[in-house]
């Protein structure tokens, strides 16, 4: 079922009973289910289920102690030639504070841009996710890009300059502070980067949390 956003997670006697959606036709519909896996992030999942009072105090204490999302910054730009020839991977930087990595999607998939145009994407993050200064640190990310590739900012045509946080962050929890996959509500599970198993991060953690939830459910 697509284009059917979840409006509520129904809980009775500490057990999940289903969800309420707005279906593709625009009608409110209740779906009965003994198991619910949410990928909306811990904060949104708690809200959909009715708020903190629905969950055990220990679960909410863990949630509130480290309720810090991980903002991310993103710049997409095009150049007439790639910053590095014959490179179809991901450059991860060790000499920067805010710039994390740079990719050249046009080198990975040439059909993504017109001939002679090379799309580049750079991602960065604040030095302290709890106290981000996104405007200043975004400019620092660009400065670090320039330091590694002198002249790039003058040559680049920027398509996207974005900062992601709040309800749509880089990750729903700061690294190392993920919530458990299982909640204190029976049958309700969280998957995604907000519930990162130890040693994982980002997209990898989303997949790992899904596997962990499957193991818990299937036994």
Predicted segments, located by residue:
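Short loop/edge segments at beta-strand edges and connector loops
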Residues: 2-4, 192
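Mid-domain catalytic core of redox enzymes
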Residues: 4-117, 129
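Conserved flavin/dinucleotide-binding core of flavoenzymes
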Residues: 102-219
């Amino acid at each position: 079922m697509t284009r059917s956003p979840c409006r509520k997670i129904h809980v009775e006697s500490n057990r999940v009973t289903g969800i309420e959606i707005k279906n593709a036709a625009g009608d409110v519909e209740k779906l009965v289910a003994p198991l619910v896996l949410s990928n909306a992030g811990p904060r949104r999942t708690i809200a959909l289920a009715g708020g903190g009072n629905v969950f055990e105090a220990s679960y909410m204490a863990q949630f509130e102690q480290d309720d810090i999302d991980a903002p991310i910054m993103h710049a997409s730009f095009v150049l007439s030639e790639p910053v590095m020839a014959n490179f179809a991977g991901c450059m991860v930087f060790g000499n920067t504070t805010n710039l994390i990595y740079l990719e050249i999607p046009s080198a990975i998939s040439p059909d993504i841009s017109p001939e002679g145009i090379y799309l580049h994407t750079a991602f960065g993050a604040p030095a302290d996710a709890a106290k981000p200064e996104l405007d200043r640190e975004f400019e620092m990310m660009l400065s670090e890009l320039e330091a590694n590739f002198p002249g790039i900012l003058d040559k680049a045509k920027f398509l996207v300059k974005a900062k992601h946080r709040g309800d749509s962050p880089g990750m729903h929890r700061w690294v190392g502070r993920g919530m458990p996959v299982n909640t204190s509500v029976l049958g309700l599970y969280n998957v995604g980067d907000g519930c990162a198993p130890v040693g994982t991060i980002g997209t990898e953690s989303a997949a790992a949390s899904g596997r962990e939830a499957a193991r818990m459910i299937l036994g």
